[in-house]
Structures are given as C-alpha cells and as structure tokens.
Amino acid sequence: MSSYSAQLREEQQAVSRAYDRLDALRAQARSRLDTVRAAGSHGSPTQRTERDSFATMYEDRLTQLRAVEDRLVFGRLDDVHGAHRYIGRIGLSDEDHEPILTDWRADAARPFYEATPSNHGDIVMRRHITLSFREVVGVEDEVLDVHSDQVGEASSNGTLTGEGALLASLNAKRTGKMTDIVATIQGEQDRIIRADLNQAVVVQGGPGTGKTAVALHRAAYLLYTHRRALQRSGVLVVGPSSTFLHYIDQVLPSLGETGVVSRTIADLIPGIIATAHDDPYAAKLKGERRMAKAIANAVAARERVPSHLPVIRINGFNVPMVRADIEQAIADAKRTRQPHNKARETFVRDMLSAMRNRYVERLDYEPEQAELNDVMQQLRMNDDLRKTLNLAWLPMTGEWLVDQLFAKPQQLRRFAPWLEERDIETLMRPKGSPFTVSDVPLLDEAMELLGPDPKAVARQKALDAKRAEEEQFAKDTLAQAGIGSGIVTSQMLVDNINGMDAELTAQRAAADREWTYGHIVVDEAQELTAMDWRMLIRRCPSRSFTIVGDVAQTSALGGTRSWRRMMDPLFGERNWQLNELTINYRNPKEVSQLASDFASSEGLYLSLIHISEPTRPLYI
C-alpha cells in the first residue's frame, strides 16, 4: 500500500468516527423526541408546556444534525505539539466531552482559513480532506512551517501542495449546488467573512474571485456568531435570479444554517408578483432616486380641500362643511408624522369633532352626552360626509397609486416635473397593466408612505393580544410549578409553543413587508438602482450589509459603476468599507491578462487581480 493510500486510510478512520458520533447523536435526539411525543397530551398544563418545549428543542437538534451530512469533515490542523484538530461543518465531542470535530465557525478553526507561512502561530500544517459521501477520496497538505519535520513526511506521502488545495477545489468540476465552497476560502476572504456585524461591507471582485462564496459564508458565520441578535430578526439574502436563490437554499443548510430569507428584488414584497420587465431606459428612469419624490408628491396630492363642500343635515339642522375646518384637520394629521392611511384616522376624528361642534353652535341649549353620541353616529353614517372626507384624504393602496401614476400622463407631469415628454411617453402604459420588476421599489416606497392596510393592522393586534395571553399563561403555570426563576422562562416557553426557531422566523419575515432584518446580503449588487437600495435599507435600519459585486460588469443602465458614488449617500462616507478580492482562481493567466489589457485600453474599471499560476486544465 502506498504512503498516500495509508494517509487516506488514516483519515477514513477519523472521518468514520465523526460520522459514527453524528449517527449516535441523531439516534439520541430521535429517541428523546419519541419519548416526549409518546407522553401525549396528558398531565397538567405545566407538564404539557414543558413537553412542547422539549419536543421543539429535539426537533431543532435533529434538523441541525441532518443538515450537515454532506462533507461533514473537510480539514485538519496540526500544531507544533503533534496534535490534530479536525475541522468540519459542526462541532462534535465524544461521550467524555473530548472534541472530535471543530465547528468551522469557531475561533479554533480560524487558522484553517487565515494561517500563512509568514503568520501561522503554532500551526505547522493544514490538510484539506475531500469526501465522496462518507468516503475519503483525497487529502492535500500545506506545510506552514518550513522547518517542521512534517515537510518531509508530506512530500514522501505525496500529499504536499502549496495553494494547490484551493486551486484544485476551485478548478474542480462545478456543480449547481456549489457545495464545496467551505474548503475554498482563503485568508483575504476570511477577514471579510468575520468583519463586524454592525457595518456595511462591500466586496469588489472580478470573475473567479469567490464573491458568492464570501457572501454565503458571511451569512452563515454571522448567524452562528450573532445568533442571539439575529435569531428573531433573521438574515435576508438578495440575489439576481431564482436560479441563484435555489443555489443558496441548497448551500446554506449544508453549512448548518436554515433561518435565511432568500429573495430577488422582484419578489421582495409579499403578495406582489412582478414578472414583466421594462425596457432598459424605462427601468433606468424608474430606478432614479428622485422617483421617491414623485411617489411622495402623489401621496401628498391626496391630502387636500375638495372644491365642493356639501351641507350635512343633522336632526333638522343644516351643518355646512367649512374649508377652515378641513385645512386645520389636514394640518393636525400631518403633524402626527404618521403614514398617510394611519394619519387619516386623526383627520377623520378631527373632522367629526369639528362637524359636531358646528352642530352644537346651532343649538340654543346645552346638549346631553347622549345626544352628542347620537350626532357622532349620524355623522359617521352620512354618505355625503364620507365621500367628502375621502376626497379630502383618500385612503389608498400602493398598487392603486403606482397604477394611476403610469396610466395618466398628467399625473407624471405634475408629480415628476423633471421628466421630459419622451420620458413620459416611455413610462406610460394602460391602466391595470401587470407590474414590472422596476415597479417593485416604487410600490414599496408608496406602501411605506401610505402605511399598512387597516385590516392588516387589526389582524396584527389580534395576534399580539393572543401572544400576550399565551405568555401570561406561561408565567402563571411557571409560578404554580414554583420554577418561575429557573432556567426555563415564560418567554422561552412561548417561543417554543409558537415554534419560533430560526426557520419559522424566516417564514414570518418573508410574509411581512415591514419586517426589519438584522443583516442583508446582496449579490450582484452593481446591478441595483438607487430605488432598489432604498427598499433594502428600509428593511435593515441598522445598515448591516454584505454587498458583493463587480462594477466592471455592470449591465443595467440604472446600476452603479462606482461604489463610492452609490454607497456614500446611502451609508455615509465613513460607515462602509470597500474590500477587494485580488486572487483569481478560475481563469488562466493568459485569459485574465488579455481581459485586463483590453479594459485598460478602453478606460474601463480594472480590478487589481493577482492571477494564480497555471494549473493542469480540467476537461468537463
């Protein structure tokens, strides 16, 4: 048996041990879950609540353990003392709590990504392990300490490489699931992945520099490192297409994370289906930042004094609607700084009070409260008054407002006066036309200014009341059991009752337009317009972003060709950082050099890419 085969056999033993432990933990979690479920619904409320809590915990554990089946182990670190540390997708220990596998996101795994021959600490060798299902099919070593005895061993074993493991992994046959991204990270990517949560990190890189790997790894790493902060808010990943999002859905679970919402710009608003596309010039016009002003103008125009004011008949008295009353009610409603539909409640309330006071002025006696209540009821039921109040402060939906804006040229002229006639002709379309992808940020802008549908507000209030009732019930049961100050809190029990794990958090976030995320990852970000960015920042007020793209590849007319020109107005000059990936592992040196020469001659943006040494071509 060759030395290389012996290395494979040695690693197979370690990998098999890790999988055996994984199987044992799965069986243990399954057994405990079955025991809890077998208890049924018997017992006191406290006992049932605790069973629900434990059942959810075991279900979550099973989901986590199942998600890391593929390529459980992918690396090993050897230190100066001769100890081995295996790196994988999850942390595992044996029954005596001795470590078997180190989670790739733990600090102990950092050298696997960051160590270099010039800065390796106590690590002397890094080994990359390749699996096919549960079988070890390849190992490659990087000796980080040239004075180590392991240099000769790795050379004689046929496992020694320089950057060969990374190059081999990146040049290997690529699959739709991109499932080998963990083992391809190198130092410059790792620093980006582990950057602080509360900032905007822009990753600029040309083709083949691993931008997408950085984006997905950063999402998984942040979910792991900041899981308390992100468990209830979640992470949003915005990609260029549904195909890309399918990749994400396949890759992130294999990293041990599932609580991520993945969307394109087109399907970011729940209930809105936008499949049509504008021509490039129309899309550019709709993507300009000043279109937010057009939407604001369209909303403000629906807060006005109608030209005709009726006289309302109440209990035999003619009570006229007075212009000054409407103007005052509009001013008071605007001062609330509430969205249009919410502020309308203040406007209507003030107008009803004003009309009641006008009625009282016509009386020669002091009315009883019962009469005043009756007058208010009559006012609420009066058709003429209701129509006039609607004309003065029209309740609207975002869909209706945007549809009207592009169906009537006079509205575009009025609300977007900077548009030229040819621009207006480009944007016009028949009323009721399907919404386009470029409409989605405008719809979101309108919905933000208008506020939620009153019916949706009522539903949310009912849900909040139900949750408060459940939490009170949990507190009462804990108090009765005498464990109110123990390790299980009422909040934990309510969360488990409602299944508020990461996956359900993602489901709730995806269904709520007003949900604010703890972090947003954007791939192919150079294609986004200013209005796209407004929509995304609205969903992450903390401005915690990972932004990935290549401004040299921008194809959209409304996209960005300068990160600074786009990012400074959004985040502020000092609140975002630009990181450039400089290693190209995909393209041969000759191809990349030719592309660089052409870009320079044409005055195009040029990434500072260090091109790796050529490797043996892989034919697929």
What are these regions (language model features)?
Residues 186, 190-197, 220, 390, ...:
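Amphipathic, well-packed alpha-helical segments that form the structural scaffold of globular domains
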Residues 324-519, 528-533:
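Conserved helicase NTPase catalytic core signature
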